Amino acid sequence: MPHPHPVVHFEILGHDRKLLEEFYKGVFDWQIEPVEEWYSLVKPGSGINGGIGAREQHTGHVTFYVAVEDVAAALELIESKGGKKAWGPQPIPDGGIVAGFLDPEGHLIGLVQGAPGM
């Protein structure tokens, strides 16, 4: 039986998006498609899709996204278990909703609701 909350997306964020794109394309031959000035979609060919982006206010990090039925309800549960909302909820272009939270040790994890491509 499939797990009800699969990991559906990953993100690699750093200061220089183009440098990261060139690195991962060169190392893994990933297909990379820019969608915004600061962000590109990554299609590795098999497995889950992801993104590479630039965020000046953050140190480099990797985030994965977990599919949930209701982002707001998931954030409430997370906070009741000792996590903290980091950002969102916010809509994304394909109609989904995303948010981020920090686990009890400060790891940033994403949530996604209703995104067809994720």
Model-inferred region functions:
Residues 28-62, 108-113:
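Conserved short beta-strand elements that form part of the metal-binding/catalytic scaffold
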Residues 6-43:
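N-terminal first-folded block
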Residues 19, 47, 73:
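Residue-level recognition of oxygen-bearing side chains
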Residues 20-24, 78, 106:
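Conserved active-site tyrosine of GNAT-family acetyltransferases
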Residues 1-21, 62-64, 114-118:
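N-terminal beta-strand motif that seeds the catalytic metal site of vicinal oxygen chelate
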Residues 2-3, 7-15, 56-118:
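Vicinal oxygen chelate
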